Swiss-Prot record:
Class in the EC hierarchy, top level: hydrolase
Organism this protein belongs to: Schizosaccharomyces pombe (strain 972 / ATCC 24843)
Subcellular location(s) per record: Lipid droplet
Protein name: Triacylglycerol lipase ptl1
SUPFAM superfamilies attached to this UniProt entry: FabD/lysophospholipase-like (SSF52151)
Lineage: Eukaryota, Fungi, Dikarya, Ascomycota, Taphrinomycotina
Span(s) of short sequence motif GXSXG: 213-217
GO molecular function: triacylglycerol lipase activity
Residues annotated as transmembrane: none
Residue ranges constituting the PNPLA domain according to the UniProt record: 182-358
CDD domains the UniProt entry points to: Pat_TGL3_like (cd07229)
Name of the gene encoding the protein in the UniProt record: ptl1
Function: Lipid particle-localized triacylglycerol (TAG) lipase. The lipid droplet/particle is a lipid storage compartment which serves as a depot of energy and building blocks for membrane lipid biosynthesis. Involved in the mobilization of the non-polar storage lipids triacylglycerols (TAGs) from lipid particles by hydrolysis of TAGs, releasing and supplying specific fatty acids to the appropriate metabolic pathways.
Entry GO terms, CC: lipid droplet
Keyword Hydrolase listed: yes
Amino acid sequence: MTALFNFWRIMYANISSIWLLVVSFFEWLFSATSISQQRGSGPRKGKVVMNKDCRSWEDWKVLATTIDKASGRWKWRFTPASDKYDYLLIDRCTVSLKRYRQRKSVYPMLMFLRSSLLRNFGNIGNSSLYTENYSGTKILIEEYVREVNNCLEFLYHTKRLSYDVKCDFFSAARISFGTTCLYFNGGTAFGLYHFGVAKTLWKRNLLPQILAGCASGALIASLLSVYRDEELNGLFDTFPSELWKICQQTSDYSLSKVVEYGNMLDISMIASFVRQRLGTITFQEAFERTGRIVNIVAPPSAVSGSPQVLNYFTAPNVLIWSAVCSSNSWAAIYRSSPLLAKLPDGSTEVCTPKNFIWPYAGLPNTGRSNPYARISEIFNVNHFVITQSRPSLFPTFYDELHHHRVSGYSLKMIRLVGLEMAYRFRQLDILGLLPPRLRRFFVDDYVPSAYITLTPTFSFSDIKHAFTKPSLSDIQYWILVGERATWQAIPLLQVRCKTEISLRHLSKNLTNSYVEPLSVNNLASPFVTNLEENQEKMLKIFKVK
């Protein structure tokens, strides 16, 4: 059985390389065909240029605006009408909120927001509204989100509401709006892609508080969970050079590394970097240090019959690094890594399965037992941002935010083939004909709420990065691949997540500004003491002999 698992593990790692070759070839073919048909102009060629030349969000934004104006699609943004969202409702609400704020009508604004603070209010989160233009969506939608955030700021600063009323409002608003989870899903050969996604979200102030990861995605999620906000800029700036130092200490760059991991830059190098940063910190300690919540998804073979989620609620004293090793138990170097827990005296002990009560242990991996559902239950998550880098699942995914260069008919056929493959694999899983060890390779878990999936886009030149000895430029390149995959999703994420982040920050500031009233005893003690001292002094001065 072990030999069979090793065979499939090696085959899975090679899928990434094979799939990279296939996707790169078709990307190159579509690009060449598109450019020849467009004769070097139009938005389709613009997409090729943007993926090729842009190295920052600012450059991408400028070029996106230029392409939209040149293609004639820029006017679409300034036309509110569309059958893809309720533009009349959004326009009416924007006008009402602006009027309440200008007139300082606090209580009507309060009631209005409590009933309308929804992530997809009026269907403004519809992903098809963000593929018409590269640079953004309808101006009306952006104005509505901006006005909602202006009203939240107004309610936070107003003196007409008591502290208790503000706390009740922001607490209810956060529960009603829900939270977002950034889920780093797998990725043997493309683990650095996750880091690029996180870097872009942080730079745009869109990094969620709740993080989750499995396999190599667990490495990136755990790394982000131990750095405070003021420390993250330093991490993102120094990560490539620090990882390159570790790569220089590795001398084994043979073809066997490609066969084993699908890439010359294998997971052990990234793991060495993360291990040095995590130390013996636990889930509870990481949350208390940074306020970020990390969820590590452990596979069935590590703890029970179904994937389990380890976080500061379910495993507060477990070392994050040991959970990361369990999540990467597919790799030979972490095959027998146990979970470790920190004791009150600072020592560690091995956690056996009997130390935990897994709520869905032994059950088939249904909707309630998958990690997405578990995270949603614990943390009120109703929106997932999934960074998908599991190469075996790429054929079954359809990135709705990609501005595809193929015709509409061809795109529908590609989508049909992907859906059919996913459906057949899921049928085999339901019938019990797909072995559990192979399930994670071909079947993705059902997401019980709204989500957006970010997948890397490859070019034909990416082949050299997978089959050559890694360099500093290669590390920077794979991070850039993740950044580029995120740029096109920024307008959608700003609409879906900006209000949530504002609510979190304002609630935090409101809590920090609270001053506990002094008790009667605390007030009386120093006053009485000073009064007695003054009375003694006065008696001495005016003492009548």
